Amino acid sequence: MAKVIGIDLGTTNSCVAIMDGAQPRVIENSEGARTTPSIVGFTDSERLVGQPAKRQAVTNPSNTVFAVKRLIGRRVGDAEVEKDKKLVPYAIVNGGNGDAWVEVRGEKYSPSQISAFILQKMKETAEAYLGESVTQAVITVPAYFNDAQRQATKDAGKIAGLEVLRIINEPTAAALAYGLDKKDTKTIAVYDLGGGTFDITILEIDDGLFEVKSTNGDTFLGGEDFDMRIVNYLADEFKKEHGVDLTLDKMALQRLKEAAEKAKIELSSSQQTEINQPFISMDRNTGQPLHMVMKLTRAKLESLVADLIKKSLKPCEAALKDAGVSKSDIDEVVLVGGMTRMPRVVEEVTKFFGKEPHKGVNPDEVVALGAAIQAGVLQGDVKDVVLLDVTPLSLGIETLGGVFTRLIDRNTTIPTKKSQVFSTAEDNQNAVTIRVFQGEREMAADNKMLGQFNLEDIPPAPRGMPQIEVTFDIDANGIVSVSAKDKGTGKSQNITIQASGGLSDEDIEKMVRDAEANAEADKKRRELVETKNQGESLLHSTRKSIEEHGDKVDPSTVEAIELAMGALEESLKTEDAGKIKGGIQNLTEAAMRLGEAIYKASQSETGAAPDEDGPRSVDDDIVDADFEDLGENKRK
C-alpha cells in the first residue's frame, strides 16, 4: 500500500514527513536539509525550487517568488495584497478573475501553481526516500485560513499531482505530534508564529482524543514582517548616511532582505551582529562604490518589532475567551514556527500565559510530523487517535439590508451541517440570490464573500410567504458547500463554494497538464546536464591518455581520436542531448583503439626485450618461476 505523506506547506520553509512504524519521521531533501525554502526561481532555461532558487535570488530578484502563501486565495485590491506589492521585488498582477497572481518573465502564475511547484519538490523528496511513487498527501494550512485559501491550497495539491486526503490546521497538526504518546488529560495552547502567518489554538487532549476548543489568528503576521522591519531600518540608516534609497533597487533590496533574515536569526543567540554588504550601491556624485557596514543589537531589533509581538497576543485573548478557559487553565504552551526561537517572543508568551512554554518539540518540523500522523490515521496505520477540529470563522448569508446572518458560528466542531429557513423580501419575487460570506463583522460587505448562486422559478406569492431552506455543510477539510431549497416546490440549487475568483476545474486541469509537461521538460533538462557531464569527463580522461601514451601509437590513431574529441567539444556547446550522446559514442570507439594500441605496445615491449648475452625465449622469463615460488610459499 502506497504511503500517504504529510506536508507542511510553509510561507518561508516547507517540510515533508511520513509515518515510520509507530513514529513520524521528517525526510531530508536532495540537498540533505530537513526543511526546504518555499522559493521558486525562474531562469532563462529552467525552474528552480528550494535552496537553488534561494541562492540565485540576489542576482535574479524579479523572477524569484517567495512568501507566495500570503497571496493564496486573495484578491487584487485586498489591503494585504497591496501591502505586499510594495515589499516584494516580483510583480503581483490581476489573474484575470480578480485573484492576485504573480508575473514572471512575461508569464502569469497563480499562487496555487507556485505552491504546486514547492509541493512537487516535497513529493519528489518523499519518492526518492521511499523508492516508490507517492500520490496522496495531507497538507497543512494556517488555522485562520478562510475557505478560499483552503480551496486554493487543495488546488495546489491537485496541480502537483497529489490527491489531498485532508487539509489540516497547522496548530492542530503540532498538537498531534506533541500529544501522540501522552495519556493524561491536558488543555494546551499552541502558539504558532511562522514565516507569514500567526495562529493560536486551544485544545483538550485526552488519551488520543484531540478536541479543538477554539482558534484565532492573523494570516498576515509572521517572520516576513519582522524581516521587513529590519530592511526598512537598514535602508533608512543608509539613506541618512549616503542619500541613496536602496528600496528603489530590486537587487539591493533582495540583498538587504537576506541580510535581515540572517541578522534576525543570529540575534536569537547573540546580543549583537554586524551587517556587512559591500558594493551595495554607488555614490551618484563621485561614482565611488558604497558599502553597508552596520551593527544591529538585539535590543534594537526588539524595539523595531515590539508592536508585531504585541499584535500576536490579541488573538490569544480572543481564543481563550471563545474556549471558555482562563490562562490558569492552560496546562502547557507549545511553541511552533521559526519565529518562536526569538527570545523576546518567548518572554512575551511566558508573561502572557504565566508559564514557561514547552520546549520538547522542534518548531520547524512539528507541523509536518503532525501531518504525517494524520496521514497515518487516514491510512489506518495509527490507531486510537480522534481529531475534532473547528471552523475558524463564522459562516452565513447576506439578508435584507445587507445584514450578515450567521448560520454556523466560529469554533464550531467540523464536519458540521446546519439549516435555516428564509423567505422573500418582495411580493411575487420569483428568484433569490444567495450570497455566502465568512467573517465576524455584522454587515455582510465587511466580511469575505465566498461566492453566490441563484434559486429561480419560485411561484409568485406575497413577501415572507415562500419558505427557502438554506443549508451549510462544512467537511473535515473546512471546505464549505451551500444549498438552497424551495420547500413549496422542492426545487433546489447547491454549490461547493469557490472563491468569487478562484480556479475553475478547467484552470486546474490546464495547470496539471502544464505541471506534467514541465516535469517532462525538467527530466529532459536533467538528462542533458548528466549527458554533458559524461561528455566532459570522457574528454578529460581521453586527453590525459593521449598526453601520457600518444607516443606509443601511430599518428593516424591519434588524429582520429582528436577529430572525435573536436566533434564532441562542438556538440557540448549545443543543447542537443542526442548529438552529444553520438559524440560520446564516437569518441568512446576511437579511444578504445588508443587503449588497444597502448596494450599491444606494452605487450610488445615486455615480450621482445633484447638480452645482452644472446636471445632468450619467453619461457626463460622469470614470471613462471615467481609464480611457482608463490605457490610454494602459500602451501607452507
Curated annotation (Swiss-Prot):
Residues 601-636 are annotated as: Disordered. Keywords: ATP-binding, Chaperone, Nucleotide-binding, Phosphoprotein, Stress response. It comes from the Bacteria. The keyword Nucleotide-binding applies. The keyword Phosphoprotein applies. The modification Phosphothreonine is found at residue 197. One of its GO terms (molecular function) is ATP binding. Induction: By stress conditions e.g. heat shock. Residues 620-630 have a biased composition (Acidic residues). Belongs to the heat shock protein 70 family. Acts as a chaperone. This is Chaperone protein DnaK. It comes from Cereibacter sphaeroides (strain ATCC 17025 / ATH 2.4.3) (Rhodobacter sphaeroides). The gene is dnaK.
